[in-house]
UniProtKB/Swiss-Prot annotation:
Keywords: ATP-binding, Cell cycle, Cell division, Cell shape, Cell wall biogenesis/degradation, Cytoplasm, Ligase, Nucleotide-binding, Peptidoglycan synthesis. One of its GO terms (biological process) is cell division. Disulfide bonds: none annotated. It comes from Koribacter versatilis (strain Ellin345). This is UDP-N-acetylmuramoylalanine--D-glutamate ligase. Its main location: cytoplasm. The keyword Ligase applies. GO terms for molecular function: ATP binding; UDP-N-acetylmuramoylalanine-D-glutamate ligase activity.
Amino acid sequence: MDVRGKRVLVVGLGKSGIASATFLQAQGAKVTVSDSKSEAQLRQEIPLLLDKGITVETGHHGERTFRDQDLIVISPGVPFDQPQLEQARKQGIPVIGEIELAAQFVPGHVIAITGSNGKTTTTSLCGDILQSGGKKTLVGGNIGTPAISFAQLANDDTWSVLEISSFQLETIERFRPEIAAILNITPDHLDRHGTFEKYAAAKERIFENQREHDFAILNADNEPCVEIAKRVKSQVLWFSRQHEVKHGTFVREDKIYFRDPKGEREIMPVADMLLKGAHNVENVLAAVCVGVAASVAPEQIRKAVSQFKAVEHRLEYTATVKGVDYYNDSKATNVDATIKALESFSKGVHLILGGKDKGSPYTVLNDLLHERAKTVYTIGAAAAKIEAEVKGVEVVHAETLENAVKLASQKAVKGDVVLLAPACASFDQFQSYEHRGRIFKELVRKMAEQEKK
């Protein structure tokens, strides 16, 4: 793709939008950026772009801005069916995302990880496994560094390990990961995709451009993944926590094994993992498949996994205050992630739920809440819906995270767990799930400091 002298519009001024705009400008494109946020909301970003000679439009998306372009690059948070984009496509203007842009400019090998839950942990772990195997590795995508930023860092021997969201997969054309994994597919982002079927179809696109010798890694315990495997053109590696598989990873007698036509290899005991929870066993199984597919030796895989700690905001132990353990799982932005968090504790859980609703029912939590939780504290815009649907456990309307932590700390007794696993997006009260998690940790640490006085 040659963008020199081309008029390119970048829509959305998040991390990937800014990275795309600055990269395209450096490549000689005539770049305009457009964001519906106000100039005041973008006061930090705008000067950086103007200094590079990039035209900035804020507060709205002008029809003419979209019309007078040779290429449009959209950020993941921008709806693919936005009217201005629909009109641009009708006019024959290509509309792609930042991941597709990266696919055309970043050299080297690509590993892509998607799924409803576990993406960030697995992507980070895969990066550690490849580094342990002596490979030049870059980790990013939907976490940390936008993939397009790797254009200046990668060469033909580099492995780019990317977390990929369903939003990013909506806009791919040539994006082809040599190794791609779907960890699981459960209801999420239904407010964006409309139906579960459309959401699953977006996830499946990760394999769309793979070739026969590439690898597709899939969860044998997840029905949508099993269905997707029937349509995959590449080599399938399975992972399963529940049963043995012929080609892939599984658990037998609390040990992780990899099996293929050449035979069976023990990788490591499950007890050697630092990660907590059954769902993290699944994440490790998937990451081991990635390591094997990338020709990393079993002992190097074992070393990386045994040293890997929980990623921030993913079932992250925060502190123990008056005998009560506090865990930050702010990344649990859907119901299935909250289920996995609850399954990590046997009883005595004080659960903080709520935020911006994503369209899934909360009734599926009820059996587990009855079994393992003492109290649910609701916060944010979804509070009323949660309070109407959650049964079999005490529910307290807390409104804010600060009040929820306060109420939970007053009610919890020694041996209990206070768990932030909201099952919702964060944007009603916070800038991001990271922001929500940081606030939770600050509140808990203040209590811990008070206890020491």
